[in-house]
Amino acid sequence: MHESNTLYGGPMTKLRQAINQVLAAVLLAGIGFYRRFISPMIGPRCRFTPTCSAYGLEAIQKHGPWKGGWLTVKRLLRCHPFTPCGCDPVPD
């Protein structure tokens, strides 16, 4: 078997896709857990529109677990009392 078959369209690509799907599912489940159990206890605190959890869901669904997860982490680091409020959509 040629190396290109294992890297591009072969077993490695399928493995990478499976890992990405599992990672995305774990991240989305974490956001769902936060929304269901933690957010109701602490109340609304996000300074942005959309909220950080909505941003995370959209970013991961739109860009995948790696880039979407990184965008979400950067957003969470910006969400604090010393940051101005406002609209901060997920980039294209």
UniProtKB/Swiss-Prot annotation:
Q: What Pfam family is a match, any one?
A: YidD
Q: Per the record, GO CC terms?
A: plasma membrane
Compartment(s): Cell inner membrane
Q: Which residues cross the membrane?
A: none
- In terms of one coarse class, where is the protein primarily found? membrane
Keywords of this entry: Cell inner membrane, Cell membrane, Membrane
Topology in the lipid bilayer: Peripheral membrane protein
| Family, per entry | Belongs to the UPF0161 family.
The function of this protein is:
Could be involved in insertion of integral membrane proteins into the membrane.
Classification via NCBIfam families: membrane protein insertion efficiency factor YidD
Q: What is this protein called?
A: Putative membrane protein insertion efficiency factor
Which source organism does the UniProt entry give?
Answer: Synechococcus sp. (strain CC9605)
